[in-house]
Amino acid sequence: MSNERYNARESEPKWQAKWDEAKIFATRNDDLRKKYYVLEMFPYPSGRIHMGHVRNYTMGDVVARTMRARGYNVLHPMGWDAFGLPAENAAIERKIAPKAWTYDNIAAMKKQLQTMGLSLDWAREFATCDPSYYKHQQKMFLDFLKVGLVEREKRKLNWDPVDMTVLANEQVIDGRGWRSGAVVELREMNQWVFKITKYAQELLDALDTLDRWPDKVRLMQRNWIGRSEGLMVRFALDSATTPAGETELKIFTTRPDTLFGAKFMAIAADHPLAQAAAAKDPKVAAFIDDCKKRGTAQAEIDTAEKQGIDTGIRAMHPFDPSWKLPVYVANFVLMEYGTGAIFGCPAHDQRDLDFVNKYQLGNTPVVCPEGQDPASFVITDTAYDGDGRMINSRFLDGMTIVEAKEEVAKRLETAQLGGAPVGERKVNFRLRDWGISRQRYWGCPIPIIHCPTCDVVPVPDADLPVVLPEDVSFDKPGNALDHHPTWKHVTCPKCGGKAVRETDTMDTFVDSSWYFARFTDPWNTEAPTTPDVVNRMMPVDQYIGGVEHAILHLLYSRFFTRAMKAAGHIDIQHDEPFAGLFTQGMVVHETYRKADGHFASPAEISITVEGDTRRATLLDGGSPVEIGPIEKMSKSKRNTVDPDDIIGTYGADTARWFMLSDSPPDRDVIWSEEGVKGASRFVQRLWRMVNDAAPIAASAPAERPASFGADALTLRKAAHGALDKVLSGIERLAFNVSLAHIREFSNTLGDALARSQTPSPDLAWAIRESTVILVQLFHPMMPHLAEECWTVLGQTGLVSEALWPQIEPDLLVEDSITLPVQVNGKKRGEVTVPRDAPTSEIEAAVLALDAVKQALGDKPVRKVIVVPQRIVNVVG
């Protein structure tokens, strides 16, 4: 066996240079082969890549290299999601301009990514902070405005008091800003919004077409869109208790069947009726002020203690005007959802039950489970939300829930209040329009001018892009564009008078909602897309990224392709940007805590193993270290591993192989030094194996032998079986399964080499074929090693340009088959026989089985039924 070691430090830069020189990963838009577009979510240029990047981009690269080998015109680009708050924070903390900080980080991260050997088309690279990119984003904003998909409206918005910017509802997590962690406040402000709700039903329906998306992501989007069918009901207000001018309270409910269980009404703190009540009652006003300081995230509202205050206003039951319901301002009702008002039926809604138990309002069950005595059915601490029949509901008693809903709807549709129906069937959506205005400097400027005479004026297309000024100061909190002495002062393009620019910039999620389309032709200076190119190259066939983007980025991107179609910039099948989506798991690592409570990094400790016990000590001084739980790699826990260190020590191929081999790709991968060392040993083993096979391959006949002996045929079957299984794994993105088959086949080939000192010509030919196949199998995962091995085997060109080997179907057929055996219809065992065995031979093998003899006992065999290649049934 060869003792020569593979030198990754020498090999990897060499092959990367050859790939770049040959431009083999550049994609031609005029290439008419079938396209395949693979894309990993582009990174934010924080300054360093982490092991999560290595895993994510390696997965995409395996897909790209495999599809390229299969003859597709592969598009595999890379860019930078470059706007955002960290650049402004760096400007404040380090006194460096956001632009300089961002582009310095891009240069550093690009250099790191290039050491990974990714098959990227770098010619298409752009950053979203490039004016040449956001020029087109501004153009699309104006085009969306023309077709009614952009509006300006005054809204109660989530205000982050630390970052001093507005956040979308999705960016409020547990009542706190997703970046700053500050408690979010509600403020009324002017806001530019994208009308995503116009596509609510379409976005919901189209989820059923996304059969290559994870079910959990589709469910998350389905729940976020939140379609519900129900009834809009108008409750008359008791004039004796109601502020002047208020006559009714409108609510939306999906459970009109429970109206006779109503015990209270509840309204949001910013509902007009609440404001009217607050004007008369200081206690109500104080409660409303307290509500405004609380979080707005649905999860926090659902888990917070239910609180309210009685306004003194009374609403009349729509079926009985003498039945008066108290109207509360409640902390669990939001103006953004439905009408900002509800009726509470505590017996059948846990939230409502918690509320009435707190304020002693009582409850009346109106749905009784089947088979239970209505007279004894009571609700105490747990609401009943199951099926049953109506009770305590007058004319609804005895009906099913479905029947009761229909009866209530019919009656309220015909009843009148103020000349309009009391009830109206309605479809409601949880989804709200996307507020994109952000009070930050480092973002895409909104191309609008505010004129005291002409009001809102779009920036003319000829004046795009509206470029960010670079001479800004961050000495004051808030938006640096507001403080700039000259940038915002302009002449109105409509009347020529003095005007000011819009100083809000776009939410950075806008930047990432269409970048995938721009990659199809980033050289177009006149328009965001080139229609014939984008329509041919889109959708993305395989998109890879984190599940944390399930709602924000992925939903916004789905809206954007539809908006771009409405504006004439794209027209693709199903209007969906991503045909296939894969959400990879995280990279996790043990944590290590020193005696003083501070965390230690993996580079600072030594691990020793004594039997089943692992101990950690500091390299400096030998002090014991507590081995903590396995957690997501993070700077705060200091459990990160620097990709540069791993690549510098072991090589990129080792890092790539380990990231793919340890666990299913949709699950977290536990980083371990032992695992990386194991991957490195496998790299060296493959290198030695190929070098051992090279002389045999060189001596093998050029022409395919007319026939193959048993050893050669066995090896060829293993090779073609591996081809089939590895490709199947890659197609299913089950990379760890593919790698296991590569290991298995390498063992088979290694055994054949060990037995074949002077192989026959047919076996030598099979060894050459099998070794070439092995190299092509691991090429997508370890491309540098594959190129080196390709050369050793005397193959021409680059393995990165070689076509995937053709599988010979005959070699996938097993010589033997295993058939289930039944005795009198009950399975008793299995029998393995040659595939072409005659019926008599199969019968004899079956009757010789101990399990069959035992099942028959003393009974004679009446007949044996053999269903060819399916099953055998013995009748006794």
Curated annotation (Swiss-Prot):
Residues bound to ATP: 635
Organism of this sequence: Rhodopseudomonas palustris (strain TIE-1)
UniProt motif ('HIGH' region) ranges: 43-53
UniProt record similarity statement: Belongs to the class-I aminoacyl-tRNA synthetase family.
Keyword vocabulary terms for this entry: Aminoacyl-tRNA synthetase, ATP-binding, Cytoplasm, Ligase, Nucleotide-binding, Protein biosynthesis
Name of protein: Leucine--tRNA ligase
Gene Ontology biological-process annotations: leucyl-tRNA aminoacylation
GO molecular function terms listed in the Swiss-Prot or TrEMBL record: aminoacyl-tRNA deacylase activity; ATP binding; leucine-tRNA ligase activity
